[in-house]
Amino acid sequence: MTNIRKSHPLLKIINDSLIDLPAPSSISSWWNFGSLLGICLGIQILTGLFLAMHYTSDTATAFQSVTHICRDVNYGWILRYLHANGASMFFICLFLHVGRGLYYGSYIFMETWNVGILLLFAVMATAFMGYVLPWGQMSFWGATVITNLLSAIPYIGTNLVEWIWGGFSVDKATLTRFFAFHFLLPFIIAALVMVHLLFLHETGSNNPTGIPSDMDMIPFHPYYTIKDMLGALAMILVLLTLVLFSPDLLGDPDNYIPANPLNTPPHIKPEWYFLFAYAILRSIPNKLGGVLALVLSILILIFMPLLHTSKQRSMTFRPLSQCLFWLLVADLLTLTWIGGQPVEHPFIIIGQLASILYFSLILILMPFISIVENYLLKW
């Protein structure tokens, strides 16, 4: 008699993707972040659902409703801080997941990679809209500045911005629609995750060597279920440490001041996970140019399969490419730091140089070094 998990129509799907899934025997802890992202999404949807039960998306009461959640709702404070810091954990895992993909050449699976980029954009949009909801100073001015960037689009820009705002400024209509979309998008993200996994399971996982591992596969359960549980435990430990000891570490103090359209904060900046893109935006003096650079800083990932000139898939055996990869990581950390600094000397020039280096590394230096490595290996 066949085991029910292999014959039942629903259990069969779960079995084929979580239990009997053939996985390469050599995948390292860098392959843990997919499951961690799934856990992050689950935490965000659950905490968000309970927060939405007490939140009101009205400009007059939004700030008060968040205060009410923290002060009066049973365990409301932990829900709020789990949700806020859960977003930070989500992005840490996302950046590490994408970084792993770049290092080990996972972008060769083009369908999986492209759905992943779509997921990245969806998560960024969700996080941005979520940051507006508490209706503090940084929420209001962040929403004003970022949505205003669309006015740089020729001809339709101004109309587009007013259409998104639902009026002539960020107001009640904007807050209400942002709440609606912030609630809806995570479920769309969950559906996209299914598509992402569907494409991944068509090809099977990559591995650190970049060499096909079809002849050396092991079942996902128990080997990788236990490994993922260890990763999940570590991530939850970090998240709870952050929530229980320093919940406002990654937030902005200005967001504890209720939104005031008549008073602009001295330094408008987004959450830390957008600072690298914000620095690239600010480093170009032209508005349209800045917006294009901002979009391209993420969209450039789409071109990775086309920019892959090496005869090897992974960077494991390519020391020159490894140097450039870690230079790119250092450059992104520099951009993140610059994004949080005021627009003055020497931060302006550092930001401009870091932005030039970012695009040069991805578009010119890394493909060129790969060709050099091919030549050195006489390929």
Swiss-Prot record:
Protein origin, superkingdom: Eukaryota
Transmembrane intervals: 33-53, 77-98, 113-133, 178-198, 226-246, 288-308, 320-340, 347-367
One GO-annotated biological process of the protein: mitochondrial electron transport, ubiquinol to cytochrome c
One Pfam family it belongs to: Cytochrome_B
Alphabetical keyword list: Electron transport, Heme, Iron, Membrane, Metal-binding, Mitochondrion, Mitochondrion inner membrane, Respiratory chain, Transmembrane, Transmembrane helix, Transport, Ubiquinone
Keyword Electron transport attached: yes
Positions bound to heme b b562: H83, H182
GO molecular function: metal ion binding; ubiquinol-cytochrome-c reductase activity
Topological type in the membrane: Multi-pass membrane protein
Subcellular location: Mitochondrion inner membrane
Residues bound to heme b b566: H97, H196
Cofactor: heme b
Subunit text: The cytochrome bc1 complex contains 11 subunits: 3 respiratory subunits (MT-CYB, CYC1 and UQCRFS1), 2 core proteins (UQCRC1 and UQCRC2) and 6 low-molecular weight proteins (UQCRH/QCR6, UQCRB/QCR7, UQCRQ/QCR8, UQCR10/QCR9, UQCR11/QCR10 and a cleavage product of UQCRFS1). This cytochrome bc1 complex then forms a dimer.
Family: Belongs to the cytochrome b family.
Name of protein: Cytochrome b
Gene that this sequence comes from: MT-CYB
